[in-house]
């Protein structure tokens, strides 16, 4: 019986010393294929991430072939702060996991063209982004943003409408916790849906 108590005590100590939460991040360099697949695919919920296609960047190398029509890749146009060692963390990479319509929107956005879509597009960004001016596309620095309109987002879902005018009259207030419009009045207007911990970067 004493031996049994000893085993139980050791098991309890071991469980107390174990990590409280394991996010599944692989050990090793952030330039590894394994780390990149983990970092980019976890921008979406598990039920999408596990069967999504993964690239190492827009127009980049295929890291994993998927089967569900969703694609995940890093979307930070600023690039890596330390290219030799890869993205510092998934937040810096700003990965997005989107459907086909979302990537039609993205392709137009980065070349300054009007998106042409067959239907609304959707994308998850559960690692958030590094900050945007909520009123003006392609503003990459807080210093260049309109006063009071800079938002560094935490986890969120986005909806890119086929018809941006359908969002007219919807709030642009990103502080309420409710869905809001980013880039209102432009061809790139879209809806941001905050989820748990959306404001964690604004409090740091």
Question: Where do the protein language model's features map onto the residues?
Answer:
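Primary mode marks residue(s) on the alpha4-beta5-alpha5 output face of response regulator receiver
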Residues: 22-204
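C-terminal motif of bacterial Sec signal peptides marking the signal peptidase cleavage site
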Residues: 12-15
